[in-house]
A protein has these predicted regions:
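Amphipathic alpha-helical packing elements
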Residues: 14, 18, 39-95
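Short interface patches used for recognition in eukaryotic signaling and trafficking proteins
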Residues: 23-27, 53-54, 66-69, 241-243
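Extended non-catalytic scaffold regions that mediate assembly and binding
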Residues: 10-24, 59, 127
Length: 292
């Protein structure tokens, strides 16, 4: 083997005791070149293997080669690869497994029941537990798909709940587990969708004869912004305060956009001033999209 060849070369060098004589021994150059050539062949084969895995599950491109090798070699023991969650999944701190600990005596694979965000430590229950069966690139793709399905389901519920509650209450509403019903990013998305919908409705009202429609809508936007500002003056935990502050940022942007529409006397939704804005929309098929 190449390891044996290198070991013999090193032992010979030690026995010779002279670096010049050791390096000029007959056949040494050819031997080392052969080892280097075979090593390059192994490296190329390994690269092709890893590229094949990355083609199946593209998020492996965000994992270093050493991490990916460790992940693939321990794929049959999912508990050992959870430490790579942050590298594989965007903004995800860890996955919660059932059972939570590795049992060497059990041949059953665990299931993912929840994922925890690394920002704000938000916890989201999977819409359905994901069994970690098969190869890592296969079951991690299933985890990613279920994460997306989970967030889509949460968004649908959030959008439906929005008009049934006061806005601040909707933003901070908690479930039985004392966790917010919506991930903060989903709340921002749902709010942005209603803002876009309301602006379009305002343009329709103006076209129908309500010349003060945008002025009236600005009053609503400012009122919503003031409600959030007042909420920051109350006792809030860090998580809820962060949710409120991020919503204030978006509401301030919405107010500025409406001010610009008023200042430039925009009367139609087809005007460049409005069409150039990034808009959150919910398509008829339930897909959330960003439109410009």
């Amino acid at each position: 083997t190449h390891t044996h060849t290198l070991s013999l070369s090193l032992l010979s060098a030690v026995a010779t005791g002279n670096i010049c004589e050791s390096c000029n021994k007959a056949g040494l150059t050819d031997s080392l070149n052969s080892v280097a050539g075979d090593l390059d062949l192994c490296k190329n084969s390994l690269k092709e293997f890893l590229d094949g895995k990355r083609a199946i599950f593209p998020r492996f491109y965000f994992v270093s080669e050493a991490q990916l090798l460790d992940l693939l070699s321990n794929g049959s023991t999912p508990h050992k690869i959870i430490k790579y969650t942050t590298a594989v999944f965007l903004a995800c701190k860890t996955l919660v497994l059932d059972p939570p600990t590795y049992d060497p005596s059990s041949h059953a694979r665990p299931k993912v029941t929840r994922f925890i965000a690394c920002v704000g430590v938000e916890q989201n229950d999977m819409v359905a537990p994901v069994p970690l069966e098969g190869k890592p690139e296969q079951y991690l793709q299933s985890v990613l798909d279920t994460m997306i399905d989970t967030l889509k389901a949460q968004l649908k519920v959030s959008v439906e709940r929005y008009p049934t509650q006061p806005r601040v209450e909707w933003l901070l509403h908690q479930g039985a587990n004392k966790e917010p019903l919506d991930a903060a990013q989903l709340a921002l998305l749902a709010s942005g969708m209603y803002y876009v919908k309301e602006v379009y409705k305002t343009f329709e009202d103006m076209a129908a004869g309500n010349s003060q429609g945008m002025v009236q809508y600005r009053e609503k936007v400012v009122s919503q912004l003031n409600d959030l500002i007042r909420k920051t003056r109350t006792q809030l935990c860090k998580r809820d305060r962060t949710r409120v502050m991020t919503m204030i940022t978006l509401d301030a942007h919405a107010r500025d956009c409406v001010d610009k529409l008023l200042r430039e006397n925009v009367m139609e939704a087809s005007a460049f001033q409005w069409m150039s804005q990034l808009k959150c929309k919910l398509e008829a098929n339930g897909e959330a999209v960003f439109d410009i």
